[in-house]
């Protein structure tokens, strides 16, 4: 291994950004093909390419950080700034959906009947499944914090237990959300109410699935003794992301389910 006189990680050439871009092209093209021609070939190919890219890219990052020691304190600091900027970009992403919702609901047009929810729309009861979903996500926020504290105290067993509980709560939330969609009295094509509801809650649901995957990777890494109380940014980033998902849901619940109904 060549001598290095600085603390920064000079990343070697990697094919994964290219295969990741290719998978994104295949998935977006595949979605268009699915919507218009009911063909899922491109979409399936895109999902497969994306899964393989993620697996191999994460494998490389884990090798560089855990086994090769490239993630020095200055590198970890840069990764922290990167994660903060990423979550900030996600905040603005969801801000667009809330803007669309409030723009339509605070001044409903005559086409909507002059009131909100629009004529003919029966909104979901915010005190039923949505309230249960809120409780589930708040509980998962508590359990992920428990996992973090356990890791800082080198309590391996409790960390694994708390992380597993968080993942199970995330899966339970996803199942509840899916059942709510199936039983919903309106669809995404039911005007501005249906489109804003399903796009905002659907993208949040996608983020819950991504967060659950992120935490599952962290659980596997913890089982393989990858994390210590001093070296665990992968888990810390997952915890930040999960708390962000929790906060977004609280805004969704108050805005769309409770006030919007």
UniProtKB/Swiss-Prot annotation:
Reactions listed under catalytic activity: 4 Fe(II)-[cytochrome c] + O2 + 8 H(+)(in) = 4 Fe(III)-[cytochrome c] + 2 H2O + 4 H(+)(out)
Sequence ranges on the Mitochondrial intermembrane membrane side: 35-40, 106-128, 184-190, 257-261
Membrane topology: Multi-pass membrane protein
Record's GO cellular component terms: mitochondrial inner membrane; respiratory chain complex IV
Recorded superkingdom: Eukaryota
UniProt xrefs under InterPro entries: Cyt_c/ubiquinol_Oxase_su3 (IPR024791), Cyt_c_oxase_su3_dom (IPR033945), Cyt_c_oxidase-like_su3 (IPR000298), Cyt_c_oxidase_su3-like_sf (IPR035973), Cyt_c_oxidase_su3_a-hlx (IPR013833)
Pfam families documented for this protein: COX3
Keyword Transmembrane helix among UniProt keywords: yes
Keyword set includes Translocase: yes
Key words of the record: Membrane, Mitochondrion, Mitochondrion inner membrane, Translocase, Transmembrane, Transmembrane helix
Mitochondrial matrix compartment residues: 1-15, 67-72, 153-155, 224-232
SUPFAM superfamilies cross-referenced by the UniProt entry: Cytochrome c oxidase subunit III-like
Subcellular location: Mitochondrion inner membrane
Single GO MF descriptor: cytochrome-c oxidase activity
EC number(s) on file: 7.1.1.9
Residue ranges of the TM segments: 16-34, 41-66, 73-105, 129-152, 156-183, 191-223, 233-256
UniProt-listed GO biological process terms: mitochondrial electron transport, cytochrome c to oxygen; respiratory chain complex IV assembly
Biological function: Component of the cytochrome c oxidase, the last enzyme in the mitochondrial electron transport chain which drives oxidative phosphorylation. The respiratory chain contains 3 multisubunit complexes succinate dehydrogenase (complex II, CII), ubiquinol-cytochrome c oxidoreductase (cytochrome b-c1 complex, complex III, CIII) and cytochrome c oxidase (complex IV, CIV), that cooperate to transfer electrons derived from NADH and succinate to molecular oxygen, creating an electrochemical gradient over the inner membrane that drives transmembrane transport and the ATP synthase.
Family: Belongs to the cytochrome c oxidase subunit 3 family.
Subunit structure: Component of the cytochrome c oxidase (complex IV, CIV), a multisubunit enzyme composed of 14 subunits. The complex is composed of a catalytic core of 3 subunits MT-CO1, MT-CO2 and MT-CO3, encoded in the mitochondrial DNA, and 11 supernumerary subunits COX4I, COX5A, COX5B, COX6A, COX6B, COX6C, COX7A, COX7B, COX7C, COX8 and NDUFA4, which are encoded in the nuclear genome.
Record's protein name: Cytochrome c oxidase subunit 3
Gene: MT-CO3
């Amino acid at each position: 291994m060549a001598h290095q006189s600085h603390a920064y990680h000079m990343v070697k050439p990697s094919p994964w950004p290219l295969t990741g871009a290719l998978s994104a092209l295949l998935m977006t093209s595949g979605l268009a093909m699915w919507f218009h021609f009911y063909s899922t070939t491109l979409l399936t190919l895109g999902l497969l390419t994306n899964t393989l890219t993620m697996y191999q890219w994460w494998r490389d990052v884990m090798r560089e950080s855990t086994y090769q020691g490239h993630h020095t304190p200055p590198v970890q600091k840069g990764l922290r700034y990167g994660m903060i900027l990423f979550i900030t970009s996600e905040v603005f992403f969801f801000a667009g959906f809330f803007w669309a919702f409030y723009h339509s609901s605070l001044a409903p047009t005559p086409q909507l009947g002059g009131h909100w929810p629009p004529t003919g729309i029966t909104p979901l009861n915010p005190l039923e499944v949505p309230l249960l979903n809120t409780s589930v996500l708040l509980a998962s926020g508590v359990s992920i914090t428990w996992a973090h504290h356990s890791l800082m105290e080198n309590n391996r067993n409790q960390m694994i237990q708390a992380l597993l509980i968080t993942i199970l709560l995330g899966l339970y939330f996803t199942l509840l959300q899916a059942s709510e969609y199936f039983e919903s009295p309106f669809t995404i094509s039911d005007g501005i109410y249906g489109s804003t509801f399903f796009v905002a809650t659907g993208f949040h649901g996608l983020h819950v699935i991504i967060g659950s995957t992120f935490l599952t990777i962290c659980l596997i890494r913890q089982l393989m003794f990858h994390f210590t109380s001093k070296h665990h940014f992968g888990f810390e980033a997952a915890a930040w992301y999960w708390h962000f998902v929790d906060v977004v849901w609280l805004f969704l619940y108050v805005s769309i389910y409770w006030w919007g109904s």
